[in-house]
């Protein structure tokens, strides 16, 4: 029996693009193999402009993620909900994970939460886990979803200095319509003529300050000003990639005496050892917040104050001698 002829087989190269990889609590998996609902937002996909808080970076970018602004106080934390609330009494805030470390998002009313204290210029990516499968990674505290934040790290190239700054101004866009001083006096005279107003009250208003006119809403509101300044230095010193950043944010509220000031600093070192088999990440972050709260009750009170009265009065007393 004759031997079979030899065969020459040539394999042709076939390049394929690898599937997306998603970093989760316990490692990395292919996006196609991950059963949970995950949305990853990179730096180039985030919102641009005068952004002063991390919530503003992803607002409107993630389906099912609801971001409601705070009470208007400068620096107030936003309310974040992933696919609505699940409890009437317990917290509905999602779990915030910063560089692999879970943090509490609880805060007193009107004060910044954990997410609001982060400098948005230090954030590299957001990953939002939106369904109950997140509890398999982080436990029951992730029942309201998870927001994973990865901050920027040192680069492998030359030293790079980055600066960004912004200034903004805002005015109260809506005020309560009220009567002016002359309209108020005319209304009282009409009520007195109809017998629905007491004569003594009408005489006091007409005679004590006959020409006084005060807009109480103008007295409590002001033009809100804000500035945000950030500088970062990144590079590699020998085998040590590093990134150092500083940020300053100052906001003056539209309600007088309301202000917020934030100082942030971050140091990131990411060396590798044993021929890149061992990676070490060292992150040091610090935040200083200074809040001055305005009396929010002044907003409602200004709509009911008498426009015929002055803001300040001076009483002169003569001594008996």
Role assignments for model-derived ranges:
Residues 317-321:
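Conserved small/polar residues in nucleotide/adenosyl-binding loops
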Residues 1-267, 272-288, 296:
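Short, small/polar-rich motifs associated with maturation and membrane association
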Residues 291-311:
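Low-complexity intrinsically disordered tracts that form flexible linkers/tails across taxa
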């Amino acid at each position: 029996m004759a031997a079979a002829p030899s065969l020459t087989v040539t394999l042709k190269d076939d390049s394929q693009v690898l599937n997306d990889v998603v970093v989760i609590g316990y490692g990395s998996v292919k996006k196609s193999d991950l059963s949970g609902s995950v949305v990853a937002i990179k730096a180039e996909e985030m919102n641009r402009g005068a952004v002063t808080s991390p919530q503003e970076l992803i607002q409107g970018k993630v389906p099912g993620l609801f971001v409601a602004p705070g009470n208007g106080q400068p620096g107030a934390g936003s309310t974040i909900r992933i696919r609505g609330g699940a409890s009437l009494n317990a917290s509905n805030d999602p779990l915030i994970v910063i560089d692999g470390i879970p943090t509490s998002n609880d805060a007193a009313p009107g004060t910044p939460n954990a997410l609001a204290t982060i400098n948005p210029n230090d954030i590299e990516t957001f990953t939002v886990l939106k369904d109950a499968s997140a509890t398999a990674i982080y436990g029951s505290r992730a029942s309201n979803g998870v927001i994973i934040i990865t901050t920027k790290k040192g680069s492998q190239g030359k030293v790079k200095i980055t600066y960004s700054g912004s200034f903004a101004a805002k005015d109260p866009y809506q005020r309560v319509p009220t009567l002016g001083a002359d309209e108020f006096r005319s209304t009282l005279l009409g009520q007195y003529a109809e017998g629905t107003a007491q004569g003594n009250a009408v005489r006091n208003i007409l005679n004590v300050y006959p020409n006084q006119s005060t807009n109480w809403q103008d007295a409590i509101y002001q033009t809100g000003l804000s500035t945000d300044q950030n500088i970062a230095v990144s590079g590699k010193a020998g085998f040590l990639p590093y990134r150092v950043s500083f940020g300053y944010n100052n906001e003056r509220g539209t309600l007088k005496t309301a202000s917020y000031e934030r100082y942030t600093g971050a140091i990131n070192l990411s060396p590798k050892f044993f021929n890149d088999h061992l990676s070490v990440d060292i992150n040091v972050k610090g935040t200083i917040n200074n809040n001055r709260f305005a009396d929010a009750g002044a907003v409602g009170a200004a709509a009911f104050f008498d426009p015929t009265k002055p803001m300040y009065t001076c009483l002169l007393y003569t001594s008996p001698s």
